[in-house]
Design a protein with these regions (language model features):
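A residue-level signal for beta-strand positions that form part of recognition/binding surfaces
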Residues: 59, 113, 154
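Short secondary-structure boundary/capping segments
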Residues: 50-52, 89, 95, 125-126, ...
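Residues that form ligand- and interface-recognition hot spots within folded domains
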Residues: 66, 120, 161
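Structural signal for conserved beta-strand scaffold positions within catalytic alpha/beta enzyme cores
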Residues: 61, 99, 105, 156-159, ...
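Feature captures the FAD/FMN-dependent oxidoreductase FAD-binding
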Residues: 70-141
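Rossmann-like dinucleotide-binding core of oxidoreductases
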Residues: 1-32, 37, 127-128, 133-235
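Beta1-alpha1 glycine-rich phosphate/pyrophosphate-binding loop at the start
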Residues: 2, 7-97, 201-204
């Protein structure tokens, strides 16, 4: 049993298929891609409207299924969603995905088998027993809310619910807590319309441009790793 038809789930299914292992793959959304399926409704963990991947195309593709060369160096979310869907179709996984199927509960029975309870696309409840379980739904699906002393009277939201800026953000002062991928994305996006944007971070971070010397930064860093430490220091 594979839970989730995102980037990890579909490659897990592909490897099962190539080794003659029967599997079911459950996906509660209507498309392949996991977080890369844009959905403007909050509640679904997804990218926001203008998301581009933070790693370059050649550093993000599957080794056995390259991304199209027509894609930009840093593809948009719709490029990624199409890429994952085409990957699943190319390797014969797509037709085995059970869309709009939600896994409700998983437990081990007395024989050490996995008992999976799920709801199908018609709203019917089922229970099925599996020898192995692969959880591939990612770790971004459940937002975590910190507790802070004091009182805040302005509007606040979790990045999980951020789908893009609206005119409501215009000329506002915005504080982003956290300098991870989501925090930096929200800061950059909101900077287009806000009056001031601040980032609060617990630990110091290096902010590196996406391009260096005309190349995607991660490709350049990978090339520099081949040089001796002494040569890298000189550079």
């Amino acid at each position: 049993c594979i839970i989730g038809a995102g980037p990890s789930g579909i490659t897990a299914a592909k490897n099962c298929q190539q080794n003659g292992i029967a599997y079911d793959i459950f996906e509660k959304n209507n498309k392949v891609g996991g977080n890369w399926v844009f959905n403007s409704a909050t509640g679904h963990s997804s990218v926001y409207e203008n998301t581009h991947i933070i790693s370059s195309r050649t550093m993000s593709e599957y080794e056995d299924y390259p991304m199209p060369t027509t894609y930009p160096d840093y593809p948009r979310h719709d490029h990624l969603q199409a890429y994952f869907e085409n990957y699943s179709k190319h390797f014969g996984v797509y037709e085995n995905i059970k869309f709009h199927h939600t896994v409700d509960h998983v437990s081990k029975d007395s024989n050490g088998k996995w008992q999976v309870e799920y709801t199908d696309n018609q709203g019917n409840k089922h229970t099925k027993i599996y020898d192995y379980l692969m959880v591939s739904n990612g770790h971004h699906w459940m937002p975590k809310y910190p507790n802070y002393d004091g009182e805040f009277t302005g509007k606040w939201m979790h990045s999980h619910d951020f789908k893009g800026v609206t005119d409501e953000w215009r000329d506002k002062k915005i504080l982003v807590i956290g300098a991870g991928n989501s925090g930096c994305d929200v800061a950059v996006e909101s900077a287009r319309v806000s009056k001031h944007i601040y980032i609060s971070m617990r630990s110091p971070q290096w902010f590196v441009p996406k391009f260096m010397l005309g190349y995607p930064a991660d490709i350049l860093v990978k090339a520099l790793e081949k040089l001796s430490p002494k040569t890298r220091q000189k550079l």
